[in-house]
Amino acid sequence: MTTIELRQLLLDDLGEIEEIERRSYPTPWSRSMFVGELAKPSSICLGAFEAEGEDGALVGYLIVSRYVDAWHVMNVAVDPDHRGRGVATMLLERLFDLTADDARRGYTLEVRVSNEKAIDLYERLGFRSRGLRRGYYTDNREDALIMCKDPVTLA
């Protein structure tokens, strides 16, 4: 089994990010969208890489923006050849670890209503459906399910 290492994404990773994005989504983000998120101090941009003993390739990534009241998951993608191996779970769990001191914000995301595997993953990690954004996706006007993970209540 492949060993995965998580680290902050860098501008040097853009080529691999874009390749995974193109292989994952019908309407991929532009390079400028990735550059903008990578440059924002309020963003968390994590990459999952094969361990150095292997080829060190990027196999997945997570991009999150800090909003006033929530951490918003902007983009999660895993290379199709590495799906089903827990990469997205590792990335999201690292997000929760990194934001533990600020978890009162909670977490939000949108996901295609047809993406049952992603919805199942998010539910396993504590996200719950909070509504729909009708016609959200521009490629086919598919609805997005709005999901939220409530802030951690500190005793």
Question: Where are the regions that the model predicts?
Answer:
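Conserved active-site tyrosine of GNAT-family acetyltransferases
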Residues: 122, 127, 147
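Conserved GNAT acetyl-CoA-binding A-motif
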Residues: 99-110, 133
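Acetyl-CoA-dependent GNAT
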Residues: 5-85, 92-102, 150-154
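Conserved phosphate-binding and hydrolysis motifs of nucleotide-dependent enzymes
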Residues: 60, 86-88, 115, 126
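Short aromatic/hydrophobic contact patches that present stacked aromatics
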Residues: 75-77, 108-110, 146
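Residue-level detector of beta-propeller blades
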Residues: 58, 129-131
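Terminal substrate-recognition subdomain of acyl/acetyltransferases
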Residues: 139-155
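Conserved beta-strand-loop-alpha-helix junction that forms the acyl-donor binding cleft
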Residues: 109-119, 136-141
